[in-house]
Amino acid sequence: MSKALANMPGDDYFRHPPVFDTYAEHRAYLKFRHAVALRHFARLGFDQDGLAGLITVADPEHADTYWANPLAHPFSTITPADLIRVDGDSTETVDGQRRVNIAAFNIHAEIHRARPDVQAVIHLHTVYGRAFSAFARKLPPLTQDACPFFEDHEVFDDYTGLVLAKDDGRRIAKQLRGHKAILLKNHGLVTVGETLDAAAWWFTLLDTCCHVQLLADAAGGAEPIPAEVARLTGQQLGSHLLGWNSYQPLHEATLARNPDLAAMAPALPPQTPALAR
């Protein structure tokens, strides 16, 4: 281990996600965080493209079923009760009354299947993510914030229209491999996380990094961080635990702006620190 990594605070320095005794408690927690994440992305303007945009979260109990925001429901008013549970094979809604965006779900379900370590998958149509994706190139480590994605994201450069076939979703999942993000050419960004909060942080950060890169390109280019330094910085900042912790201020700020949703927060285990709420 390098001295720089050895000097990093250990995992015990940071907060950790809560642990639940029952599936029901865990599910209620995930659905609440799911709704808060959608409200967060609404504030960023990531829900302005009609029917596009999906966050899926694996159900903690029922294999190959995933909680999703329903088709055509505004992110800005979503609540846990609005979320639907969708079967990964049939794409039928098994809990709730609404339908899911099939094209997006075909991507998400195949990623979940290929990556059982992933709790959440996020794909939203953002301005900067779509613009940068059109170049079909990886994001350079231009800044410290981009380093968590250095050697930890991929590009899918075969845009063929809506992903209406499961095979197309499988190809995207295969290209993603074990990474935390993938840029879909002419389409946008996808991030994944071992926790929903980490996936939400990676998505927020990745879109910001795309914005920075586009600004730098427009100004005539910029010098990226050397590979060995970018790799080290990515190891320092790119863990899913750091991603989870980095998202907590955004979660708390979203609750402060949405008291109606904050009032729906489920009870947490007694040992859970306040920051994990």
From Swiss-Prot:
The EC number(s) this enzyme carries: 1.13.11.83, 1.13.12.23
Catalytic activity as recorded in UniProt: 3-dimethylallyl-4-hydroxyphenylpyruvate + O2 = 3-dimethylallyl-4-hydroxymandelate + CO2; 3-dimethylallyl-4-hydroxymandelate + O2 = 3-dimethylallyl-4-hydroxybenzoate + CO2 + H2O
InterPro entries in alphabetical order: Aldolase-II_Adducin_sf, Aldolase_II/adducin_N, Aldolase_II/adducin_N_sf
Required cofactor names: Fe(2+)
Cellular-component GO terms for this entry: cytoskeleton
Signal peptide start and end residues: none
Regulation of its function: Activated by ascorbate.
Pathway: Antibiotic biosynthesis
Domain of life assignment: Bacteria
Keywords, comma-separated and alphabetical: Antibiotic biosynthesis, Iron, Metal-binding, Oxidoreductase
GO BP terms, alphabetized: antibiotic biosynthetic process
MF terms in GO: actin filament binding; metal ion binding; oxidoreductase activity
SUPFAM superfamilies: AraD/HMP-PK domain-like
Free-text disruption phenotype from the record: Cells lacking this gene are unable to produce clorobiocin.
General function of this protein: Involved in the biosynthesis of ring A of the aminocoumarin antibiotic clorobiocin. Catalyzes two consecutive oxidative decarboxylations of 3-dimethylallyl-4-hydroxyphenylpyruvate (3DMA-4HPP) to yield 3-dimethylallyl-4-hydroxybenzoate (3DMA-4HB) via the 3-dimethylallyl-4-hydroxymandelic acid (3DMA-4HMA) intermediate.
Entry's family note: Belongs to the aldolase class II family.
Quaternary context: Homotetramer.
Identification of the protein by name: 4-hydroxy-3-prenylphenylpyruvate oxygenase/4-hydroxy-3-prenylbenzoate synthase
Organism: Streptomyces roseochromogenus subsp. oscitans
